[in-house]
Amino acid sequence: MKVFKNVALVGLCLFALSFTSLRAQIVIDLKRGGVVRAKTIDDYREEAKVKERLAADSLAYVDHLTRALNALGRDSLAQAEQLFKEALRVRPEAPSNYIVRHNLGEIYLAQGRYREAITRFSEVLKEHPEVGEARYERAVSYYEMGNQQAALEDCSVLLNGNPATHLRVKALFLQAGIHMKSRQPHLAKTDVEEILRLDPDNQNAHLLEAGALEALGQSQNALHKLDAFVEAHPENVEGRLARAELEMRLTVPDLAVKDYDAAILLAPENPELFIGRAKANLQLKRFVAARKDLDAAVALGIPRGMLNAYYQQLKK
């Protein structure tokens, strides 16, 4: 996952450099029972020390944030993480810290440190529950940890909060994926239909709808959907692959081979396509072609041991 730099952070961190002068000319001396007295030179000296310390802290805070954002630009996530943490240490009460925590959460999400990501996103949402990206990313983190219920709850809160269209689409995709995984394709289909209402040309949504149709027992409708998709997007590898896999499940391997042929022309570096075509060729008893495909997959990095079951079928 790509970690996005928050441009707003730059503006907010500059706020840390703003200080209001201490204009009061009197103090309440608590040590003397709350007596109101005029300021002395010692009071002014102490104020000056505090202001100097705050100014130094704020300069360090802005420096840490600037360097952290530059590190993100170089994809130096470990360095960015340390700099963001230093910024929080220097100015633990800075108004922009929720954005710093959000960035840390995104770093952890990108690194697969889902529990830590959830902690950071939760800190953001506790202070600013309206930050939709943090809620979506927490849902993704929950999903990756296998906590589908918590992921669904975050999706529900987000979708009920009238998010921006792009964020709504992402949440609907995640929700649809959870529904498919939990064997509720009718709910997934509803999610996908909403995505297509918002974004009629969304190719991934069309493919997911075909998957939901098949899961609902409507294999022919799913195939018709994929036929239309491939006709409209002949260079989409995922579309060719989805139709080939469905054709294999429908026991028409000769059609699957044609789709694998087209997909391999589009993505000759993808070993999974060669494995898929090998399976189809094995069903068609085309053993020479199947061996060539298996060998091609091995040449592309698939360990031969993982394909032993298919190589064994060549000897039958």
Model-derived segments and spans:
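Conserved structural position within tetratricopeptide repeats
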Residues: R89-P92, S122-K126, V157-P163, E193-R197, ...
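Canonical tetratricopeptide repeat
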Residues: T66, I99-N103, E137, K170-L174, ...
